[in-house]
Each structure stands twice: as C-alpha cells, then as structure tokens.
Amino acid sequence: MNTPEHSQLGKASAYADQYDASLLFPIPRADKRAEIGIDGNAPFFGADLWTAFELSWLNLRGKPQVAIAHITVPCETPHIVESKSFKLYLNSFNNTRFASEAEVRARIRADVSEAVWRGAEHPGTVGVTLLLPEAFDREPIHELDGLLLDRLDVECTRYQPAPELLAAHHDEAPVTETLVSHLLKSNCLVTGQPDWGSVQITYSGAQIDQAGLLQYLVSFRNHNEFHEQCVERIFMDIWTRCRPIKLAVYARYTRRGGLDINPLRTSHPQQLQRNVRTARQ
C-alpha cells in the first residue's frame, strides 16, 4: 500500500522531461478517514478542485505550448494523488511532443483517473479542462462569500484540532448562514511545511457559536495533514458536534509548486463550486 512516507515529499527528486505516467503516486483515503470515524462510505459528497499553473508541452514541430489545467477529483475516489508526484508528472510533459491540446487533456484525464480510481469496483473518471493563453484574461479572482469570522476578537491558545471548541445554540430558532475565515493554516503531513488557506462554511440548522468556530479553525495551525484530510476533519467535527441539517465546507489553499488544491465537502448533493482563485492564490 502507498503511504505518504513512501512518496517523493521531502526528498531530492530528478525531474523527468519525457512523459511518464508512473510518476503519479496515489495515496488511499481510507486510513485518514478511519481516524475521523468514517468506515466505508463517506457521509458527504464533493470533490477536490485542483489548479495546475505550470503545464507545458511541445507541439509536433517542437514549439512549446502552455496552459492552465483545472482538474476535478470526486471525493468518492479511493485515492488522492500526492501533490509533489503530480507536479513531477506534469513536468514530464515538458519535452514531449503532442499533436494537440486535446491529446494532452485526454492523457491527463486517463492517467489521473487511473491513479485515483485504482482498485475501485466501479471506476469513474476525473474532470480536466485546459485553459490556453488566449483565454487567460478570463480567469477571475474572487474572494469567498460570507460573513467574516476573523472580525471577532478572540483569544486563541489551542493549535491542534480541538473539536470541543465547537458548539451550537439548539434552543434557538434555526438559521442558514455562510461563514468565512482566512486564518486556516495546517502543515504538510510529511514535510511539516506550512499550508495556508481560506475556508467557507455554509450550513442550515442551530446557529453555530462563531467565536468557538473561529478558535476551532485556528486550532489546525500546528496540525500535520493534507488539505483534503483537513477539510474532511472540519466537516465531520462540525457535523457531529453541531448537528446541522445541511453543511458544506469549502477550502481554498495557496499554491505550492504551481498547484493549488481546493476541497469541497457537502452533506447533500449540490452543484460544484466554480474553480475560481482568491487573491492569495
């Protein structure tokens, strides 16, 4: 079984410049999900929205081509792809000739689909779109909508996940609201390098205590976990401790190595967020 410790994270790596799908390193979701009480089917829907800003290949005449790639990985996949391996994989396109942008897109879709669905009884596919330079100026920047939790003047003393900080007012009328914080920080599971993000929490149900929620989000500050795992932990902690009727947790992390990863988890099926970067990304 692939584990994060066996990946290229934190290790010196040779950069292949000829296409090599074997560089992709899938990691099972199940182990980390078991830590947060998920055994079998996950109690949420959603996807991991990836943006790759450093993608280049050669056309058949050897001229370099560039694009921005948007990749959508359903959260039902049994694996994630370790991000450094994905960077190395994309770099392997650099000196490889392809007939068209469509061929590159199809190759990425097939390779990533095989990696994340590996071993699944009913494998599916991932979504891949490539944005070419003539469309770059149509890539918007937009901050997450919602009431900013960071306005609250709270004392923060916990820097490992502390779900006991979460509470909801079940003796009051239910509400529907969207809350946002830009203070999310965690660390890479393997290297300990900081990961910075913004998080949006939309829910219906008993009103969540906002001060406690902000303190809870800050408590991830020294926690070592991948982006996808942090968002699933946040979702499960709010779901079990605050017991909302509906819940969506969406985080956008700043890029590293030309990649950003933006997980979305929802209690009910809904249309995926458009993959729009924030100013910090």
Curated annotation (Swiss-Prot):
Subcellular localization, as worded in the UniProt entry: Cytoplasm
InterPro entries per record: GTP-CH-I_C/QueF, NADPH_dep_7-cyano-7-deazaG_red, QueF, QueF_N, QueF_type2
Protein name as catalogued: NADPH-dependent 7-cyano-7-deazaguanine reductase
Role according to the record: Catalyzes the NADPH-dependent reduction of 7-cyano-7-deazaguanine (preQ0) to 7-aminomethyl-7-deazaguanine (preQ1).
Upper taxonomic lineage: Bacteria, Pseudomonadati, Pseudomonadota, Betaproteobacteria, Burkholderiales
Keyword Repressor: no
Pathway membership, UniProt: tRNA modification; tRNA-queuosine biosynthesis
Name of one Pfam family that matches: QueF_N
Annotated binding of NADPH, by residue: S83, K84, R256, G257
UniProt record, GO biological process: queuosine biosynthetic process; tRNA modification
GO terms under cellular component: cytoplasm
Catalytic activity: 7-aminomethyl-7-carbaguanine + 2 NADP(+) = 7-cyano-7-deazaguanine + 2 NADPH + 3 H(+)
Transmembrane segments: none
Enzyme nomenclature, EC number: 1.7.1.13
The family this protein is said to belong to: Belongs to the GTP cyclohydrolase I family. QueF type 2 subfamily.
Keyword entries, A-Z: Cytoplasm, NADP, Oxidoreductase, Queuosine biosynthesis
Catalytic site: C188 (thioimide intermediate), D195 (proton donor)
